[in-house]
Amino acid sequence: MSKTSSRPTVGIVCGSGLGGLAELLNDRQTFKYADIPNFPQSTVHGHAGQLVFGTLNGKACVCMQGRFHLYEGYPVQKVALPMRVFKLMGVETVILTNAAGGLNRDYKVGDVMIIKDHINLPGFAGVNPLVGPNRDRFGVRFPPMSDAYDRDLCKLARVVAAELDLSQFMREGVYCVVGGPSFETIAECLMLHRLGADAVGMSTVHEVIVARHAGMRCLAMSLITNLSVMDYESQAKANHEEVLETARQRATQLERLVGTLVGRL
């Protein structure tokens, strides 16, 4: 914080292939993760690995160009560490994006799902970023998660999408996080769909848990970059290149959506 005069109130986390959101910021100041003491490093293609400060529609923002995942070998607490850094900077609202596989049979590639709730599958086995001694300076020992995704922000996202004529590909649903890096099997996809998940991915949830623990409001959106395979006769296979290509095609509209949203906060 000694190297920037910016005091952001909005934090933005860019998902795979969506790092262009950071380019929307004015008066940008960029710091590589490698130059930040004790900060993890991005190792995934499509994640630039830098923290960008600036303003967006009059709001002071900090943007993560690249996030961290369990499959990179980081402890879950390290994956979500940036959320506590955000809190200490003064961030009040976090907007998170990710790339996800569609489980809902009504979804299409290129749809954007506003996350209304999540299933923390690794959490069933104790993989939760709040495990260990509670950091009382951030929040309580047992934080509720029934309001993890701010309902007013979700409503605002729908309103803004309608104003920008983007409603035709907007959805709202439940996101399930898995550990990765292997994509899900057919049986796993069928199970997750029956559990009530509309989309599946490998990020976001751990960040949201820590952000909510610290009292920040959260809005999260998934870009549906592939449809999960749930048919044993299908020859389709998920791949990361497909994820990045879909993100590239939808990037401009997502940037407009997020930029307008930030201006309304």
Identify the meaning behind each predicted range.
Residues M1-M145:
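Metabolite-binding pocket within alpha/beta catalytic cores that recognizes anionic/polar moieties
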Residues P8-I12, K59-C63, E92-I95, D111-M113, ...:
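Structural motif
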Residues L70-P75, C176-G179, G196-A197:
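Short, flexible loop segments at the rims of nucleotide/cofactor-binding pockets, characterized by
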Residues F138-S146, R194-A197, Y232-A247:
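Glycine-rich tight-turn/loop motif centered on a GG-T
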Residues P144-H193:
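Active-site rim beta-loop-alpha module in soluble metabolic enzymes
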Residues V229-L265:
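His/Asp/Glu-rich mid-to-C-terminal helical/loop segments that flank catalytic regions of hydrolases
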